[in-house]
């Protein structure tokens, strides 16, 4: 037992079976005492091939080779040698037998005595995951004397000074202290430590699991400080009773991940990157540095962090070759010295001197101690000591699991590496399902370069099965594609490799993997991780046995079953009585798994059956034919019986169906012959649908009608507002209501109100300057606006009320329509009932027999309806004939009242076609009558069409009757035939007719008779029809006459209604025309009234001006006389140039202006007026201000919204037609003169020193330069101020006051000035001075009447040179009676200082003098008729 186990465990010097343990101690003692040669010992040790290979021959007692004793605790527990319990004893006594006894390695735990299990309880940790051969190779490098670079000094865990927002500063400080105390110098906290800390919170496991998943953001199984702080924070949340979030808030997640990245980047990267690991050995110089020192086997230290250092005392040996101990075969033999075994540090690296040399291997297999990692397989290496023992494979943990016990190539029967499979446990731990695996994974440590065979070992299969069961939680037996992607993706391989692996593992393309296929996939992944390429085709060793055997088994079973079916002659056999067990003839199933012909062969199962089929004899074939014939006969007999039963059932069902049909026919006949049957179809679905469509049409018209009503309401509101404006303007002529707004729709805007207020202020100012009271206004400024707003509010309120009423009507109409629609729907049928009705009445979706029956019922119903209609018509005809016979004298009355009952009878008893035809006939009659009334020729064949229609209807009715009777006869014959067929038996012949005959002819069916009496009934009906035909024709003629009379009466009523409608329309049009005429007359009347008012005002002004002129003449005569006396006295005195003009200028210009201004109002509008200025003169100031912006509201064309159209019409209606000559010469500033700011700018411009410039520029189109005056006030402030005065009601009064005050300073010329000034006033714009341009205009128009005065003397020096400096001042034109102009002589005396000017001309003159304007001499042209006035010479 020991030999075989040690063979697979790799022990080379294991004891021979049966040898006592104490017999080995002398050799251990002799070897320990320093013997260097191997004496011929017992033969049991001779054939022990150890793991050193060639070294065995020269090393002598080479049993003390390094023994790999670090086996897992579960398998090789007693393999720890030289550890506490044995080490002190060996150190004290040297080479004592107990020491060697404690080194029995490689034995199974159950095969050793209890005393050898003491060293296993030394407390050393057991390594769970073996290292790769590359790691072992790197660990050998320090044996050669080259010390590895010292690792960087571990610094304390540095936590960045970053403040976490989700915890307080105090909590963060506490957590930092706790974290540092837990992790020490590390940067992360292990999962176990974190678990220990988290469990102190006493929270449930589910909450702690959630906390771990949320905290471990890196999914590394370790916690950085921010993750640890987050875990503490979540624990605090749960302890305080709050729920854990399903996912971390984005802010917290970002903070934690950022801080983790900072900590990760702070880790110093001082260690050199390891070289790329390959299967190539490292043949560097350090390999040969320590050749003299024999290898020092180390005692096993599994899972010690210094395990790599324990192995560094061995010489650097590249692994990967097929040698169990990792030594090269080419290495030179070691010298046979016992000193090589002295420094055996079997548990403490770097301290070999503390342990005594322990000769191991006498009782145990020589195994390298201190090394428990997996090693490549070691081929048997015999040492020459003997060949009676089988070669031993040593040095592997998985050597126990890699024992081939079956045929090579099968799963689990493979020469697996004796040292096991590296990193298979790490791969298992990586792929196991665990919480938090969703976040990521790391494939670090999974790759290697171990030798992996094609086949799957048992241990590997067990690991893969455990993985499969762990992931297959529901025990489905397979793993889906999504789960497999998650598992295989954690291996870290490329997607392309995983796709190829999946294709190989899932050959049937089922999208899922069972346990064996999953093992194949994992094995391919494991091979790929160890550097093997993924094969393009799955090798035979990896084909799952279940799949391979299943396919073969299925093919075998199919062939066997097919051949067995061919061999079995059980065609006519019905039971097991004829069965005979014949082993020779039986095909016989032989399992290929239990009985194998050879190594790989299996029994050809189909061979026997094929041979037996070929060996059938003729008798056997005949027997089979006979049996098959018997079976066929039996089947035929069974089919016949079944057919008979089915026929019986069909006949019974048919009889029941016929009975039901007969009952249905009787019920239908009863319904058709019922007196109220005509009212049955009045409320049909078609009529309901028609009514619903009509209702929808009417409902669609409601919005259109409502919109029309709203439009009419809107027009009414606009007309009412316009009418109110007209009435208000009529009642308050001087109010602001006469203003027509310039806003949209004629509304008065704020600008219009501002203009109106400005005009009112100018009117009041003019009245104040004129010394007259302000003209009384009917209302204040805002009264008209308030009245308009009140009326507008009233109209709007009424419109809103009407709108509310309209909406209420709309809503009520909609509600009524909905109620009607609901009533129509309620009366109708539901979808299910409608489906049933259409199925059983319209024969939709039923069988052919049922459909024919339904059509038969419909035809019989129509036939009965036709019969009833004929009878009803006959009865109606008889009643009409009797009524006409009883009352022959009441023809007229009967003709008037007969249409109504006739129509009702026809509508009640006639068919739908008849009613349609009658309606069409009546419509044709009405059309013909209307055509005749319109003078068109109606159709001549109207009477013929009626007769033809009657004949056609008669023939159709006869045809329908005949067809109905034929159908009745056919149905009766068919029924009789069916009854005869069903009564096949002689016993039922007498009973069945008696029971079946009465239903076809129930007593209620009056129209039906048997087949024998149908002919007589038909003849009787034909005779009755002939007799009734004449009566019916007579009734039809009478009915037609009555209908014609009724149609004529209706047409007459319609014509009367049309005439009444036309009369009403004409009356309405007349009322509308009268209303329009009334509105127009009102406008004209208002215009006439306004014109009369203006004429009266003009006459009053003329009278006032005339009186003022007369008074002025008297004063002027006295003043002139006084002036002449003064002139005579100072004749010898020379007047200065400056005084003369100062004294003379008021005499010439001011009286001229004062005399002209009164004449503006008294004179009739002369030729050449501009439309707007004349309007300003005639109309009120409020109207004149807005005449250029908007039309007045009193024009006849008030309906037009065009302001220009109103303006023209208003001007035409109020102003006499002027001559067109002066109009083109109007200045361009006229269109802009209504702006008060423009006038202000003109005033500012005129107040400048060059005040004469605006005057000539303004008069350039109308005035000649030679008539201009250097110091004239044409462009000064006098223009604008006089304009304001003119626009006021008392504007003329101010000028009258000026003429009264200064009238004596000039010759009295009222008439000439009055006659000639008005055109100038009217030819200028409203805002420009009406009086200023007048003198140049008059001078231009009448140059011949007034000769220019002589030039002044050379003494004066004009200040402002101008081309017209020598021209006289602009004198007004004089009448023919004016005296000749006095010659220029002595300048007149200065005017009295107390005489102020009447207008703004005086201020303008003073301003011009102050500005430095020089005055020239002027002469006064005296054209007055006063004889007492003398001439003033310049």
Curated annotation (Swiss-Prot):
Extent of Polar residues compositional bias: 55-68, 88-120, 306-341, 361-370, 600-611, 895-910, 1144-1155, 1320-1329, 1421-1434
Biased composition (Low complexity): 28-49, 349-359, 1173-1193
Annotated Basic and acidic residues bias: 783-814, 911-929, 949-981, 1016-1063, 1085-1105, 1112-1124, 1257-1266
Annotated EH domain residues: 171-259, 460-549
Region of interest called Disordered, as start-end residue ranges on this chain: 1-133, 271-380, 587-615, 768-814, 862-1063, 1078-1434
Its membrane topology: Peripheral membrane protein
Biased composition (Pro residues): 294-303, 1215-1225, 1345-1395
GO function term, MF aspect, one: calcium ion binding
Location within or outside the cell: Cell membrane; Endosome membrane; Cytoplasm, Cytoskeleton, Actin patch
Gene Ontology BP term (one): endosomal transport
Record-linked InterPro entries: DUF1720, EF-hand-dom_pair, EF_hand_dom, EH_dom, WH2_dom
Record domain EF-hand: where: 203-238, 493-528
Coiled coil region boundaries: 607-815, 941-1137
Domain WH2 per the UniProt entry, residue ranges: 1401-1418
Family annotation (Pfam families): DUF1720, EH, WH2
Keywords, in A-Z order: Actin-binding, Cell membrane, Coiled coil, Cytoplasm, Cytoskeleton, Endocytosis, Endosome, Membrane, Repeat
Function text: Component of the PAN1 actin cytoskeleton-regulatory complex required for the internalization of endosomes during actin-coupled endocytosis. The complex links the site of endocytosis to the cell membrane-associated actin cytoskeleton. Mediates uptake of external molecules and vacuolar degradation of plasma membrane proteins. Plays a role in the proper organization of the cell membrane-associated actin cytoskeleton and promotes its destabilization.
Subunit comment: Component of the PAN1 actin cytoskeleton-regulatory complex.
Family listed: Belongs to the PAN1 family.
Protein known as: Actin cytoskeleton-regulatory complex protein pan1
Name of the gene this protein is made from: pan1
